[in-house]
């Protein structure tokens, strides 16, 4: 049986309507503030959307220029052409025209590789260092860049700084796939520094990290030779 509605309940104001009335009264008395806040919110949305579209277009153009440089370099390599400053300039143009882009970051990495191949290890170190300023921690290229800097210092016979670079690679947060290579690099530097104990320690770490049977045999031979 349905509950009988009392006269008091009928005459009682509708609570929802009362809330609407209060909201309407607030809006009427605070129009200027509401318009200001709404305008700011809309402006923020427009700016955010505009910035997002701008960055998308910016990155797309940068990537296009980077792709041209990369494809040109690959074609030259297939044709047996030697590296030259023109190849490096193409990547340099990406950095100059689109600083802060992902393509510019990768251009530093490619330039590091190219300078090393050309024998300009100081320029190679500078390029890799710029790359490391931008690359995220999760990227395996970070480990490769640290190792590459280590090779540069090793080529300069600066063993302490080479060791530091290889240790930076070993301490990076990613790059488990390059762990064995990094340990071998550290071990080799310790061996060159005549620190046999540390060399053995890291050759053993490299051995424990490798899944390649031929590399495993090679490392065992080195370890037995040092012992």
Where are these regions (language model features)?
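N-terminal positive-inside, membrane-proximal cytosolic segments immediately preceding the first
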Residues: 2-40
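Short solvent-exposed coil/turn linkers within tandem alpha-helical repeat scaffolds
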Residues: 97-104, 118, 133-142, 169-179, ...
